[in-house]
Amino acid sequence: MIKPRTPPGIMELLPREQIAFQRMLDVIRRNYERFGFLPVETPVFELSDVLLTKSGGETERQVYFVQSTGALANAAAAADEGAESGGLPELALRFDLTVPLARYVAEHEHELSFPFRRYQMQRVYRGERAQRGRFREFYQCDIDVIGKDALSIRYDAEVLAVIHAVFAELGIGDFKVQLNNRKLLRGFFESLGVAEGELQLAVLREVDKIDKRGAEYVRDTLTGEGFGIATAQVDKILAFVAVRSNGHADALAQLQALEASVGASATLGEGIAELREVLELVKALGVPETAYCLNFSIARGLDYYTGTVYETTLTDHPQIGSICSGGRYENLASHYTKSKLPGVGISIGLTRLFWQLREAGLIAGIAESSVHAMVALMDESRLDDALDIARRLRIGGINTEVQMEPKKVGKQFQYAARAGIRFVVLAGDDELARGVVAVKDLVREQQFDVARDELASTLQVELEQAKAMLVSGIAAN
């Protein structure tokens, strides 16, 4: 007999936790749509030559390739005959949603309206080394606004407002969207004489490690043999990336102080101007100033970011790290089209976030059942009646399960409690004679009678009240 087991790097949930995960997906989707983003899905696998156009290096070593049994048999037969390998398999599983988006926009460019606002919430696959908290299959929840030839900086502010709306409704604790601009970093490095493009990118990658590795690690790296930057310059870099703002007015003051102390080179001036505009628009969008700040150490390790960059963290759980990140890029699909397609977007790695929240004990409170009521069956002769009650409840919008076999009432209550079902509906001879049903509320530990015709509406009111209390509790926090 084969031992049942899942591959390493997979998060498989039991129903109660799956419901909590699904509700987080629903919140994210609802807010994406509220801001006018349109849904897109792309195939789980792409043509290898399309998917791997601009990857190489570490990414290509993590890609899962796809082959049919027929293709494997043909390859084996060719090898037996001494033929050379045909190279990589034709198909590969996507490792993020950005490259498929680039292909999608380039392929459908003349059918889309620009700026194109898309959201995508699908699984991606990477051959990560198996370790706790790292996943080989995981959900990414992305939004992007793609322009044709140009895209206003105003969209960068709107994306920050989307981040705020999502995490405010998720209700998983206080959070902070940390904001920076790659032009700010590049302009500052230029003022120190670190102007060469590849060197700047390498320094940016090291700066992006400060929160994880610490300032001393970055200092040693930048002054070491690989970089050889003078200690005095590195000290200025570390002082610069230590800047954090506290409130809207302070953020603007920090930008003004930077401009006065360094002098506005063309690149630095652009970065400062863009951040100022984003900050003013974020205020107009109603994002509270406690929800965002400037953080000059935020660089984002990916080379294609060129302007605004975001990192979002939970205030009370910094060990979780970034829960949402993204930024501005100048040309999404340069490998697939000659058109210039600038954009701005973010990604929420929901699988890792959910796992981290569960580890921190922050999931239990929302892990309810999606079944609202269960109709108990105490006697075989009452089956038709129980099915009719369930039918009426479902018509009334109440998710309902029926016990199909008669059991002792205590066992049926026990089952409902373990399954997280709030209401148990009972209809015995006494209730039938009085034209009512009995309802046991397992949350409040109360039992009451309800007229049959009013059962669905009564339970709907109870559920709405519970939902309102949950929402007010989240708002209070």
UniProtKB/Swiss-Prot annotation:
It is found in: Cytoplasm. Keywords: Aminoacyl-tRNA synthetase, ATP-binding, Cytoplasm, Ligase, Nucleotide-binding, Protein biosynthesis. Disulfide bonds: none annotated. It comes from the Bacteria. Its EC number is 6.1.1.21. GO terms for cellular component: cytoplasm. GO terms for molecular function: ATP binding; histidine-tRNA ligase activity. InterPro entries: aa-tRNA-synth_II, aa-tRNA-synth_II/BPL/LPL, Anticodon-bd, Anticodon-bd_dom_sf, His-tRNA-ligase, HisRS-like_core, HisRS/HisZ, HisRS_anticodon. GO terms for biological process: histidyl-tRNA aminoacylation. Gene3D superfamilies: Anticodon-binding domain, Bira Bifunctional Protein, Domain 2. The keyword Protein biosynthesis applies. SUPFAM superfamilies: Class II aaRS ABD-related, Class II aaRS and biotin synthetases. Belongs to the class-II aminoacyl-tRNA synthetase family. Homodimer. This is Histidine--tRNA ligase. It comes from Xanthomonas campestris pv. campestris (strain 8004).
